[in-house]
């Protein structure tokens, strides 16, 4: 019971309390999107005493129009994967997630920091999906690159690789977009919505792959490139999840959670002030409506 209460408290703090506080903490000393995002995300990791360690020789790449492929474990992905790309992440998410976590996902990630784009699963055609990706790459107003969970679903507790979805790999081939894997172990220990658990003092081990380029002289078709990427993903995944990293933690470099890349994009202050006004108004109006309803019922 205590673990369950701790889980719900953590979810509330991460997705409601801290985003709300951050919205009102921002002032004109924090003018840039990535700085604001960094202060929020790094604070979440510090509150949980979650530490990130790079276990690979390669580091995060910021090649033009790169697409990051990350393993999908739990809601903690959205906090940790922001940090491991040096705050250059733009998540692709089902639109339903915006309804489940409106303050964090829609207002905070999408509106303020341009770190989230949405699609409707089962209702977005492949051409429309590709146009969505292309539009965001051509109109990059935040310096963020696409991050995709190519497994297609959360796989907390499943420590073996699966075949990847083909869509974004095919797109990468057609549009000559490089791909980099960022596979992290232990993300779901920080926050796991399937088991209703949240832990502190978690060590997350992060592996950055080399950058894979869709060389059309080497890969004669989209399917050839897919098969290569799929095989590389499985090999990398097994290497990350098959090793005991805790015993070698002293050999790894700790990732700097405040390091940002390309922090040159400014927060939309009129939008921020509008969000503040809406939150304050809701905090006043909603309780007033509830109280009024109780008064009417008691009459």
Identify the residue ranges that each predicted region occupies:
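Structural element of the ATP-grasp superfamily
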Residues: 41-45, 81, 107-110, 171-172, ...
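Non-catalytic C-terminal accessory region of glycerolipid acyltransferases
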Residues: 132-299
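Structural motif
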Residues: 125-133
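Short secondary-structure capping/turn micro-motifs that flank functional sites
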Residues: 61, 126-127, 188-189
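Short acidic-hydrophobic, aromatic-tinged amphipathic segments that line or gate anion-handling sites
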Residues: 54, 116-120, 214
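Membrane-anchoring hydrophobic helices of lipid-metabolizing enzymes
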Residues: 1-69, 76-80, 264-275, 287, ...
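Residue-level "edge-of-site" marker
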Residues: 58, 123, 185
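Catalytic core of membrane glycerolipid acyltransferases/transacylases, capturing the structured
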Residues: 13-25, 48, 62-123
């Amino acid at each position: 019971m205590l673990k369950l209460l701790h889980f719900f408290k953590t979810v509330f703090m991460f997705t409601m309390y801290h985003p709300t506080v951050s919205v009102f903490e921002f002032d004109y000393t924090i003018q840039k999107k990535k700085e604001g995002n960094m202060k929020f995300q790094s604070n979440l990791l510090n509150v949980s005493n979650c530490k990130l360690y790079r276990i690979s020789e390669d580091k995060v790449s910021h090649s033009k129009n790169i697409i990051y492929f990350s393993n999908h474990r739990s809601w903690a992905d959205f906090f940790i994967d922001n940090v491991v790309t040096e705050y250059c992440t733009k998540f692709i998410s089902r639109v339903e997630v915006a309804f489940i976590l409106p303050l964090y996902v829609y207002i905070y990630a999408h509106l303020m920091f341009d770190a989230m784009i949405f699609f409707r699963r089962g209702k977005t055609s492949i051409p429309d999906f590709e146009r969505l990706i292309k539009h965001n790459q051509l109109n990059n107003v935040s310096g963020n690159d696409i991050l995709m969970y190519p497994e297609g679903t959360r796989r907390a507790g499943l420590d073996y690789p699966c075949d990847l979805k083909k869509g974004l790999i095919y797109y990468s081939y057609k549009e000559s977009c490089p791909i980099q894997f960022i596979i992290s172990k232990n993300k779901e220990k920080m926050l796991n919505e399937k088991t209703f658990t949240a832990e502190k003092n978690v060590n997350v081990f992060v592996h950055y792959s080399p950058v894979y380029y869709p060389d059309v002289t080497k890969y004669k078709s989209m399917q050839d490139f897919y098969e290569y990427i799929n095989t590389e993903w499985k090999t990398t995944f097994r290497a990350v999840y098959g090793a005991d990293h805790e015993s070698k933690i002293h050999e790894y470099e700790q990732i700097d959670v405040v390091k940002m890349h390309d922090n040159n994009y400014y927060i939309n202050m009129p939008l921020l002030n509008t969000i503040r006004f809406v939150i304050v108004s809701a905090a006043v109006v909603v309780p007033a409506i509830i109280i009024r309803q109780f008064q009417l019922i008691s009459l």
